[in-house]
Curated annotation (Swiss-Prot):
GO terms for molecular function: magnesium ion binding; malate synthase activity. Monomer. NCBIfam families: malate_syn_G (TIGR01345), PRK02999.1 (NF002825). Involved in the glycolate utilization. Catalyzes the condensation and subsequent hydrolysis of acetyl-coenzyme A (acetyl-CoA) and glyoxylate to form malate and CoA. This is Malate synthase G.
């Protein structure tokens, strides 16, 4: 039974109350009980509006379902459908042209294009690794990944392999040729680097293997250095707004094998990182929410630490310090040692038992997230922490899963109330709008208008957006297979539309226009071939699954000047509303029994592999092996798309409930085997009826049509609490 404190018209779980009163509030100047009083007032004033918006979602969905059912068996009439959506209020007027006016935005968001990490904030090690992924070793990323083949004696092995090391150095040299080309020759031919004076500014000089000397093709590419001018230990380069270090040490195990003594090339990598309270996190009660907020506190005050065992040694992880150099102009130069951190709060749907209102009802979780994470951000805004996160005096909150401009307006109103409660200046709280719901996509310009003074981020997300696409049009007919979605008309239009509308609304120089996640952290060669498409599409950030991926993806932002791409794209609209409203239906399904079973196997295995860790162990994001044992980074978005596709096929008779249950049981055995090495794992196949996780997975599919917008949170939260009560974990 949760112990609660009555304060401010609320009933607050004891552990959360203590966290605020004893750990968060004292240094901020905010009275702890006054904080809860403000929250109570916000809940009373805005709670009903929150519920109205959710009711509106349901009413719109019911109307769309009814429209499709009335035309069942008829060819889809796109023109009539569009008119219906306008009359329904689903499609809203775009309104006049405008430009965002957001101010006090850090350059990492407003000016610099680069990789973005997203990590579950309740995992301290992941959070610290992400915050510290601002800088990453290119040598390590290349040596340990599949970017370089392991043939011709270049195996990774268990200890350093000089043959592989040579290939790493050659690849890194080619990267330097793109980042900071020499006036003559290549970095791979350099045998010594040094610095010379040039009218009061240092200039890089390189001696080549033929004895000739050269400099950078663009001398301004040298930003700074460390060490002696005739024997530097670090050369700091700058290109497309990103920095790269050449680290030199001829005595080093690696450096001694390089002609110029280069022991590493360090990339400025994850310029920004989203600390996630949402889709990658399993936080279902006061205990879980308290852990989430405590880690955010540790990131803001600089005290977060964790330890891990590596090679028989205990390693302490903490936030990295800033990096100091001598600037090329001779003055001291300091660069941030950490990624600029944003935080993703939950959306408008869920409520939380961590705090109850005066009537004993759970309060909206998004309102609680906003208040507590903003209170904690005062450590940064008031300079109370060990390091600064925002140097512009802003806090960056990403809001997910909003449906249309009214819901964005509600979030903006909430932010204003939070600022008033915490004594912040207006528009201190900036907003990132995830474009991952269909009603937001088709009304994106109107959504941005509602947040035009706060907007710092929009992005696309294939997985959630496809889940909503399928749920919205559930009654329209059977959907195409999951793999075919990526080449569908609506999806390509969605990706272009997001960039074009963002540029049209003046986000350039003020906000990020982002692209989605590469979900295969072990397949870096594939990422290097494919993900350059994101900067080429005009996105100034894109999601990566690991610090290694961030280091490698950073290369793409040297190969592509995103600012120039955005210049070319400005003023265009490459997609139309008609494209966006194209429903991804299979009008005449002719799949073979084998193809149908293949789709069932693939999706059931993925659902079970993710849900079993979520429900039984509270792991909201992890590398889950797929049916071919390829590790995929899974979160609730991947679960949403898989469960909604199967729910759609079941509803339209492509498969039967018996087929799904047979597949679920067979795939549970596969997942059990894949997790056999995990001592904390509870097998599902030993007792299907008794496995809470197995039952949760089945419920998500068999009752997928009933889930609000196809979301998985209601089932997952209820089942996770059931598992905690049953197993005590």
């Amino acid at each position: 039974m949760t112990q609660r404190i009555e304060v401010g018209g609320l009933q607050v779980a004891q552990e959360l109350y203590d966290l605020v009163a004893k750990e968060i509030a004292p240094a901020t100047g905010v009275d702890a009980d006054g904080f809860w009083t403000h929250l109570g007032a916000i809940v009373r004033d805005l709670g009903a509006r929150n519920r109205e918006l959710l009711q509106k979602r349901d009413e719109i969905q019911q109307a769309i379902d009814k429209w499709h059912l009335e035309r069942k068996g008829q060819p889809h009439d796109a023109a009539a459908y569009k008119t219906f959506l306008e009359e329904l209020g689903y499609l809203q007027p775009e309104g006049e042209d405008f430009e965002a006016t957001t101010e006090n935005v850090d350059p990492e968001i407003a000016e610099v294009a680069g990789p973005q990490l997203v990590v579950p904030i309740n995992n301290a090690r992941f959070a610290l690794n992400a915050a510290n992924a601002r800088w990453g070793s290119l040598y390590d990323a290349l040596y340990g990944s599949d970017v370089l083949p392991e043939d011709d004696g270049a195996e990774k092995g268990t200890r350093y392999n000089p043959v592989r090391g040579k290939k790493v150095m050659e690849y890194a040299g080619r990267v330097l040729d793109e980042v900071a080309p020499l006036a003559q020759g290549r970095h791979g031919d350099v045998v010594a680097y040094n610095l010379v004076d040039d009218n009061g500014r240092k200039r890089l000089q390189a001696r080549l293997s033929d004895g000739s000397e050269t400099g950078l093709a663009d001398p301004e590419g040298l930003a700074g250095y460390n060490g002696a001018e005739d024997d530097p230990t670090v050369l700091l380069l700058r290109h497309n707004g990103l920095h790269v270090e050449i680290q030199i040490d001829r005595e080093h195990l690696i450096g001694k094998d390089h002609p110029a003594g280069v022991k590493d090339v360090v990339m400025e990598a994850a310029v920004t990182a989203i600390m996630d309270c949402e889709d990658s996190v399993a936080a279902v009660d006061a205990e879980d929410k308290t852990a989430v907020y405590r880690n955010w506190l540790g990131l803001m005050n600089g005290d977060l630490e964790t330890s891990l065992e590596k090679g028989g040694k205990t390693i302490q992880r903490r936030l990295n310090a800033d990096r100091d150099y001598i600037g090329a102009d001779g003055r001291a130069l300091t660069l941030p040692g950490r990624s600029l951190m944003l935080i993703r709060n939950v959306g408008h749907l869920m409520t939380t038992p961590a705090v109850l209102d005066a009537d004993g009802n759970e309060i909206p979780e998004g309102i609680l997230d906003g208040m507590v994470t903003s209170l904690i951000a005062l450590y940064d805004l008031k300079g109370l922490g060990r390091y600064r996160n925002s140097r512009s005096g802003s806090m960056y909150i990403v809001k997910p899963k909003m449906h249309g401009p009214d819901e964005v307006a509600f979030a903006v109103e909430l932010f204003g109330r939070i600022e008033d409660a915490l004594g912040m200046e207006r528009n201190t709280l900036k907003i990132g709008v995830m474009d991952e719901e269909r009603r937001t996509t088709v009304n994106l310009k109107a959504c941005i208008r509602e947040a035009k003074e706060r907007i710092i981020f929009i992005n696309t997300g294939f997985l959630d957006r496809t889940g909503d696409e399928m749920h919205t049009s559930m009654e329209a007919g059977p959907m195409i297979r999951k793999a075919e979605m990526k080449s569908s008309r609506w999806l390509n239009a969605y990706e272009d539309w997001n960039v074009d509308i963002g540029l049209e609304c003046g986000l350039r120089g003020r906000a990020q226009i982002g692209k989605g996640m590469w979900t295969m952290p072990d397949l870096m060669k594939g990422m290097m071939e494919a993900k350059i498409g994101h900067p080429k599409a005009g996105a100034n950030c894109a999601w990566v699954p690991s610090p290694t991926a961030a280091t490698l993806h950073a290369i793409h932002y040297h190969q592509v000047n995103v600012a120039e791409v955005q210049d070319r794209l400005a003023g265009q609209r490459r997609a139309t509303l008609d494209d966006l409203l194209t429903i991804p239906l299979e009008p005449s399904p002719s799949w073979s029994a084998e193809e149908i079973q293949q789709e069932l196997d693939n999706n059931c295995q993925g659902i079970l592999g993710y849900v079993v860790r979520w429900v039984d162990q509270g792991i909201g994001c992890s590398k889950v092996p797929d049916i071919n044992n390829v590790g995929l980074m899974e979160d609730r978005a991947t679960l949403r798309i898989a469960s909604q596709l199967l729910a759609n096929w079941l509803h339209h008779g492509i498969c039967s409930e018996e087929q799904i249950m047979e597949t679920m049981k067979r795939m549970a055995k596969v997942v059990d085997q894949q997790n056999a090495g995990d001592p904390n794992y509870r097998p599902m196949a030993a007792d299907y009826d008794g496995s809470v996780a197995f039952q949760a997975a089945c419920e998500l599919v068999l009752k997928g049509r009933e889930q609000p917008s196809g979301y998985t949170e209601p089932v997952l939260h209820r089942r996770r609490r059931e598992a905690k009560a049953k197993f005590g974990a």
